[in-house]
Amino acid sequence: MRKLFLIPLVLLLLGLQSAVPPSVEIALLKYRGGGDWYANPTSLPNLIEFCNQNLNTNINPDNATVDAGDPQIFNYPFVHMTGHGNVVFDDQEARNLRNYLLAGGFLHIDDNYGLDVYIRPQMKKVLPELDFVELPYSHPIYHQKYEFPNGLPKIHEHDGKPAQGFGLFWEGRLLCFYSYETDLGDGWEDPEVHNDSPETRLKALKMGANLIQYVFSE
């Protein structure tokens, strides 16, 4: 008879667990200049779902959108940026991003193919004293829950260049990770968007989960 009482109790506890409000929120960066900051609308929701299921995170399933110059950016420990084209940060936006990053924030820039020539000079406005350096394959970001012994996975081929991961470091802390020639965000999108294979999408999601785990554990 006691077992019969335990069943409703277990169901109640499971219900309470599922009702726990999200403990953290991540954001997509909105910027000026004409580039498509909104390029991959299903990317972050899918990455969040994957992380909540596989890393036991409790991230709000609905990501926020934050302007580069908005002080609200300090509410988000992880900010994702993507696009194909032009990016412009004015002085106030560059200063806001700088303060955010130096205060402990993290920016993931994902080259959606074509972003490179625009984002590098703009990040120089944000952190003029820093240069992007390629992360070695031994860096912890490639060795979180999921192992990537050869660095970033190649999700979309484009012009055949190798995928590379670059970082900006401040006093030894990685505060910006730039995934180049890989298109991680495309791999996070709904399957029908790019018709990537399940294996390719899984590689992209696992690498994205590593980014989240690295940032949340630092």
Task: Give, region by region, the residue ranges found by the protein language model.
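Sec-dependent N-terminal signal peptides
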Residues: 4-14
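Aromatic-Pro/Gly-enriched surface loop or interdomain linker
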Residues: 18-78, 82-85, 175, 183-184, ...
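An acidic, glycine-rich "communication" segment
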Residues: 25, 30-34, 42-43, 116-192, ...
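Short alpha-beta junction capping motif
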Residues: 26, 78-117
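Sec-exported extracytoplasmic/periplasmic mature domains
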Residues: 52-56, 102-105, 124-128, 216-217
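Surface-exposed patches in mature extracellular/periplasmic domains of secreted proteins
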Residues: 57-67, 109-112, 130-138
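Alpha-helical scaffolding within the catalytic cores
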Residues: 61-68, 85, 90-95, 160-164
